[in-house]
Amino acid sequence: MLNSPDLILSTSLIPESDFAFSDAERQALRVLAEQAAELAARPIEIEKRALWTRHNALKPTRPVIFCDPENSWNEIIPPEALACQNPIARAWEFHLRKQVFWGAEMGDDYSVLPYFPVE
């Protein structure tokens, strides 16, 4: 029952889309991806990834700080701030905007990753 394809498809977080992104959507995603990549390449982000690796391996580290706005992301990045209209482009834009905000504003030990997870 729990592995029923109908259940899996009906509860999927992946929005339906034809992947027909407009030129403006592609450009908006490219700009955000470039910003996220620049943040991820900073030496501090590399240090944070090493810190988390040591911490998760149960090696002595300083306490790590992780600030996740969780349900407040829609206040930090309101829907009207998103440029993309295509559902998948919009989800990717939201993800990238979160990464840029986290890397530029948050000041915690979360590390902006140098890759884009497509799930």
Language-model segments: residues:
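N-terminal basic, low-complexity leaders that serve as flexible interaction/assembly modules and, when applicable
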Residues: 1-119
